[in-house]
Amino acid sequence: VGRNFGSSPTKIIPVKNRSSFAWLLAATLTATLTILTLTQAKGCGNYLLASTSSIAPAAAAPAPIAAETTANNRIQIAFLLDTSSSMDGLIDQAKARLWNILGEILKAEKNGEAPTIEVALYHYGNTTLLPQNGYIQQLSPLTTDVDAISEKLFALKTSGGDEYCGHVVLKATDELEWDADDNTVKLVYIAGNESFDQGEVPAIDALGKAAGKGIIVNTILCGNPNGADGNSWRAGARAGKGEFFYINQDEKVVYIPSPFDEAIEKCNLRLNKTYIPIGSRGAALQANQIAQDANAQSYGQANLSSRAKFKASSNYRNAGWDLLDANDEDPSRVLKEKMSLPDSLSQLSEVEFQQKLTSLKNARRSLQREIQTLTNQRDKFVEQTRRKQSGTASNTLGAKISQSLRNRLVQKGYRIKK
């Protein structure tokens, strides 16, 4: 780990202290943008947002940037993470590879359609949690709001406790809104380092209930696979009809920088400027979007590129707070809330307002296409660089889950794009 190869060395990105205040200030400044128009520009994307009093003419809507999702083409994933005192390495790897893991799903298509991605997050084994709840907490239900998942993940702190795997699997099985459709991919990934059989809830019972709902439970041991604990985690995977992995939680995540990362970062900044908050929580959620960019970038520019790739996909939707996504989902809501928008928008006539939305939407799609092109080039560069490197495969959380996802999606009839 950490060897240099040619002009593009691999880098081990250390964890940095993260302060949100500067980013919240940036979010506030972004939210005060009052006039958004399109002007031709060089560099990232075909468009650049600028302040001007003119209204750009509406352009013909471009073709969709990616395959559309359907309700019958869904992937649901719950991550159950041990946050007892010995699990700092596990949580660090989860933070470092969240966007890389989600990016694997973006490569999947079935019948030419991209899947909808829903993610849930639990943590367990933490002494700050209530013992009557089994030291377990649901941090997020199944949701398409991946920024919320990232926010909860980056807030996790470890603290010693008792780890009850059967209990947390049972809670995830019972509490989450799992799709009843057999075509939906339903996966649980549980990671920890103590015996899988601890606690009052028998693991075999919880796993049986999950299997009854078509949920596949995969187990990830952070430790020696050849000891007694390894046997219990293997047995858990067998009963859960899933896969067993073991990882070295202390192994540092290795990033391969690329010549495309800087351009991707610039595109991402411009993409953010196409988001206009709407509703009572709009400004706060816009600030969270920027905060999660900062969290991703705290692990390096290459990691931000992985997040930008997801943000450029059809799975990144923010209808709850973004003007454009809200208009796509419910135009009547936008009209009702129009007067709460900045004067540069609220004072426009209906025709001018629709022109503005169309222009802004075209700018976003242009930037998304640009990011997709750049990240595809980046992926090819990284893969070629990795093939040139010698050594063993990565034994980290992200690498194991990514490989597992590819295998499972192929089994369910998905095609994985290169």
Where does each model-flagged region fall?
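A post-motif C-terminal structural segment
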Residues: 234-333
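Composition-driven recognition of long, C-terminal low-complexity regions enriched in serine/threonine
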Residues: 12-13, 29-32, 212
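N-terminal secretory signal peptides that target proteins for export/translocation
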Residues: 1-18
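Hydrophobic membrane-insertion alpha-helices, especially the h-region
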Residues: 25-37
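Intrinsically disordered, low-complexity, compositionally biased regions/tails
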Residues: 6-10, 138, 283-286, 304
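Divalent cation-coordinating acidic motifs and surrounding scaffolds
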Residues: 19-22, 38-251, 258-259, 329-338, ...
